[in-house]
Amino acid sequence: MQGILAEIELDFPPLQIQEKIATILDTFTELSAELRERKKQYAFYRDYLLNQENIRKIYGANIPFETFQVKDICEIRRGRAITKAYIRNNPGENPVYSAATTNDGELGRIKDCDFDGEYITWTTNGYAGVVFYRNGKFNASQDCGVLKVKNKKICTKFLSFLLKIEAPKFVHNLASRPKLSQKVMAEIELSFPPLEIQEKIADILFAFEKLCNDLVEGIPAEIEMRKKQLDYYYHLIFSKIAHFSKQLA
């Protein structure tokens, strides 16, 4: 094996470029590791603060909990068919949320407004079971379910955090296309502390989530910048190789 490796011939760009490429690749590794660590850290604290036993440790051993199914505390709806062509032909300010999970689930923006206020959406197909908290004017595609809290004992933000943990557990993998239907969502059972405690926990998690998202959003931007730097050096190397090849021809 050592003999084979010894015979391998490698071409190297100038040392300065080697060092720059190595530095960029090291940065990729570090940024990717930090991205994973931030997401793990957030998930750990979210799960800890939403655990019933931990809530009692923090707020008192005698804190009561009430258990409800989603259908008992929410109006459950589904979005409508909104095509990309419709979005192109009806541009506006109101987002259309779909089964996408990138860009906050936003497919585009139109003039229409099907929902206005505090809601929860979830993806019903594809990347099913991904939950988002919404507050404002928006629309939802047919691959997006919509919840509106109707019980005054429930904090919408708190419910959204609970569902981010629980909803993925109820996703059905049918013919390699995961689904979380309205019917299944309606039957999910959740336990809630008093409203005042829900609001305190939701405020903590919302602030922490925003902080983590701000940090996480900055990391891909840094990675993209490093990719552009790497592309620059690759182009520089290959243009020189092409130049030398022409001279040798």
From Swiss-Prot:
One Gene Ontology biological process: DNA restriction-modification system
Organism this protein belongs to: Mycoplasma pneumoniae (strain ATCC 29342 / M129 / Subtype 1)
Domain notes: Contains two DNA recognition domains, each specifying recognition of one of the two defined components of the target sequence.
InterPro entries assigned to the protein according to its UniProt record, in alphabetical order: Restrct_endonuc_typeI_TRD, Restrct_endonuc_typeI_TRD_sf, Type-I_RE_S_subunit
Stated name of the protein: Putative type I specificity subunit S.MpnORF615P
This protein's record includes keyword DNA-binding: yes
Induction comment: Detected at low levels after 6 and 96 hours growth, there are fewer copies at 96 hours (at protein level).
Taxonomic lineage: Bacteria, Bacillati, Mycoplasmatota, Mycoplasmoidales, Mycoplasmoidaceae
Annotated SUPFAM superfamilies: DNA methylase specificity domain
